[in-house]
């Protein structure tokens, strides 16, 4: 009888835990083979081969025109990068890292005697929805939190991301 009672309590506990809203989603669709960001249009596309799987509205760095060169310039990088990691503990809901700076970015900044910056991400907007409109990040790509949950589940490490002006 004691065993049945424990089993029942565990079943209830797991059942209630499963009812909670989780920011971690499961994606079982086609592999995202590339990401394209079109800064001028404020759009991001997740693509499988030649098929656009998803399209998102984005916000960029607070000084978005041009390629990121230095720490604090407020620009979002341009060029080819890779998804470097997933961060489930981001202060912006969830985030995935972008491999900025690359070798060329680093060489240019060092040649100028400056820091290229880093920690560029695709992330959510937690607590920034009402305070900031338009481009507000330090150089990252921001999307709505619900969209970020979807993107987080769809992207894999080393997925190429092409960021166009």
Predicted regions and their residues:
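Sec-dependent signal peptide recognition
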Residues: 2-9
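C-terminal motif of bacterial Sec signal peptides marking the signal peptidase cleavage site
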Residues: 15-18
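Bacterial signal peptide processing site
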Residues: 20-22
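Exported/periplasmic cell-wall-interacting domains
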Residues: 24, 30, 80, 85-165
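Short, surface-exposed loop/turn motifs at beta-strand boundaries within globular domains
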Residues: 28-30, 37-39, 51, 76, ...
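Post-signal-peptide N-terminal segment of Sec-exported extracytoplasmic proteins
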Residues: 35-66
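Short glycine- and Lys/Arg-enriched binding-loop motifs that mark or flank ligand-binding interfaces
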Residues: 57, 68, 75, 120, ...
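Short, surface-exposed secondary-structure junctions/capping segments
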Residues: 66-83
């Amino acid at each position: 009888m004691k065993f049945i009672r424990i089993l029942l309590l565990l079943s209830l506990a797991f059942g209630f835990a499963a009812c909670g809203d989780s920011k971690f989603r499961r994606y079982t669709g086609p592999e995202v083979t590339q990401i394209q960001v079109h800064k001028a249009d404020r759009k991001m596309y997740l693509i499988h081969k030649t098929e656009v799987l998803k399209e998102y509205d984005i916000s960029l760095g607070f000084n978005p025109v041009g390629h990121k060169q230095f720490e604090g310039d407020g620009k979002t990088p341009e060029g080819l990068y890779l998804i470097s990691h997933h961060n489930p503990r981001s202060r912006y809901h969830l985030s995935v890292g972008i491999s900025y700076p690359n070798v060329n970015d680093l060489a240019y900044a060092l040649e100028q005697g400056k820091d290229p910056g880093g920690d560029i991400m695709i992330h959510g907007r937690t607590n920034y929805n009402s305070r900031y409109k338009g481009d507000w990040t330090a150089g990252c790509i921001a999307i709505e939190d619900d969209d970020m949950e979807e993107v987080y589940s769809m992207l894999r490490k080393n997925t190429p991301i092409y960021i166009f002006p």
